[in-house]
A protein has these predicted regions:
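N-terminal glycine-rich phosphate/pyrophosphate-binding loop and immediately adjacent elements
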Residues: 1-128
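Rossmann-like flavin
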Residues: 88-194
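Short beta-strand to alpha-helix junction loop
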Residues: 154-163, 206-226, 379-387
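Helical element adjacent to the flavin cofactor pocket in flavoenzyme catalytic cores
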Residues: 200-251
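Mid-domain catalytic core of redox enzymes
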Residues: 242-360
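C-terminal segments that line or cap access tunnels to active or ligand-binding sites in enzymes
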Residues: 310-419
Length: 486
């Protein structure tokens, strides 16, 4: 029995079915995908969650384990430029071609091209060790890490240094530093608190490339869902899990809001870990206290806007990052002194630049994302409207084109929606921050400490936040189930 059909739940379901288990997935919503759902309105097609497709090798590896290829389920195109970064008075397009990127770095900071070579050589080593070894550890014991290749490479992995300090060793120009720190924002912590190990994300960005699955990120969900069906997985949609029954130190049944009761030999929780622990389990069977959860460093939540325009915008790219205000203040308002941001950085995805099927002809599909602290209150319509006007005004100023008058559709999604729709702890969007003290065995365990047949997968356990890690998380937990239950 698997609770939730997000990326991790879909992954776990397929691995369990491949091993010969009868698998049932209970999903709260009426479609698969969890936070990666899709909605359609007025001819626009919006991805509700992830919008970046990085680490294509992880997706290819996933499907290959079932004798399939990514191209059996969806088609990819590499974006070039990969993305654009706006500062106050300029912007830079990040080319997909590495030689062009070296030239760009050299123009900005003489001598930095060779430094970029050295930086990425280190990042490549971390990526290879991380993707071939570290991320597949279930985090159940320190003994998992008594691996000679890991031990001898410990200092090369740079786990005790911060990514900020690591980047500053190589580059002096503030724009280059921001470019190299940007990928770790996906990991949910400030650069000075994120281990330099995660420069592997720079390798993923630059050498792996930025891709787009035709039809949007939901095409990946549909592909994984189709694979699971082919393997015999049963899906029960609109089944909101409300409780479990425990017998003999094991979950015996899972109950849903409709009053249905599902017997279970093994349960894998792919929904929010905190929700399952604190809301579904009786107190004596919770592995962690509420105090434990309240002390976790959470990745940010998001203020999201899905926007449809009745015209095309000239010269914009699929992905754009807006670093046109100081990062430090926004970072403090997310991590140090949680509050609604004064003047936030933001990100815009315009999938209609790459895909004519996500918007009506001569229209534009825009997705705005503003990172905000997890756990904020007063998520009101007035707050959402205020930030929408602020962000659109800055967007207009940076791209030099009017936008507001062309808006014919907009919908917001924020803290309270993450809680209501996904039972998200503190309304987080990405899970736990990837700090050193929340890495590997220091994350919430992928196996319950109190119930022998309850396991967890997804962004609040190993290996961490992000779509590729979620695919891996499903594989890791499935192998743990097989290890203990055959």
């Amino acid at each position: 029995m698997i609770i939730g059909s997000g990326f991790a739940g879909l992954s776990a379901a397929s691995f369990m079915a491949k091993a010969g288990w009868n698998v049932t997935v209970l999903e709260k919503h009426d479609t698969p995908g969890g936070r990666a759902r899709q909605f359609k309105a007025d001819g626009f097609v919006f991805d509700m969650g992830p919008s970046w497709y990085w680490m294509p090798d992880v997706f290819e590896r996933y499907f290959s384990q079932f004798g399939k290829k990514v191209s059996d389920y969806y088609q990819l195109k590499r974006l070039d430029p990969s993305y654009r970064v706006y500062w106050k008075n300029e912007f830079i397009d990040i080319p997909a071609n590495y030689h062009a990127l070296r030239d760009l770095f050299e123009q900005i900071e003489p001598g930095s091209a060779k430094k970029l070579d050295r930086f990425l050589e280190e990042a490549k080593y971390k990526y290879q060790v991380g993707l071939n070894n570290l991320v597949f550890k279930p985090g159940q014991s320190l003994l998992e890490f008594c691996d000679w290749d890991l031990v001898k490479g410990l200092f090369r992995l740079d786990v005790f240094n911060s990514i900020r300090a690591h980047v500053q060793k190589y580059f002096k120009d503030q724009r280059l530093r921001q470019l190299m720190e940007f990928p770790v924002l996906f990991l949910g912590a400030m650069p000075e608190k994120t281990p330099a190990l995660y420069s592997l994300m720079n390798y993923a960005d630059i050498m792996g490339g930025t891709w787009y699955p035709e039809g949007g990120m939901y095409s990946v969900v549909e592909g994984m869902y189709q694979l699971a069906l082919e393997l015999g997985v049963e899906f029960r949609f609109s089944q909101n899990v409300t409780g479990v029954e425990v017998r003999s130190e094991a979950v015996s049944t899972v109950k849903t809001e409709k009053g249905e009761i599902f017997p279970a030999d093994v349960v894998i929780g792919g929904a929010d870990y905190h929700f399952i622990e604190q809301d579904l389990l009786p107190g004596p069977f919770q592995s962690y206290t509420s105090n434990y959860w309240n002390k976790r460093d959470m990745a940010p939540s998001c203020l999201l806007y899905f926007v449809g325009l009745n015209k095309k915008l000239s010269g914009i790219l699929h992905h754009s990052l807006f670093f046109d205000v100081p990062f430090e203040q926004h970072a403090r308002e997310i991590y140090s002194s949680p509050q609604w941001p004064t003047d936030p950085l933001f990100y815009v995805s315009a999938p209609s630049v790459s895909d004519p099927h996500v918007a009506p002809a001569s229209h534009e599909n825009l997705f705005f994302l503003v990172p905000v602290a997890a756990g904020l209150t007063n998520d009101s319509h007035e707050i959402r409207k205020k930030y929408f006007e602020l962000i659109v005004e800055r967007f207009e100023a940076r791209i030099g084109q009017p936008v507001r008058d062309a808006v014919i559709f907009w919908k917001s999604f924020a803290q309270s929606d993450f809680v209501e729709q996904y039972n998200s702890f503190k309304g987080n969007a990405y899970g736990l921050a990837n700090t050193l003290k929340q890495t590997a065995i220091l994350k919430p365990s992928c196996r319950s400490r109190k119930l022998k047949n309850l396991f967890y997968t997804g962004q609040l356990t190993v290996p961490g936040p992000g779509v590729p890690p979620s695919l891996i998380s499903g594989e890791v937990v499935a192998k743990q189930v097989m290890k203990h239950f055959g």
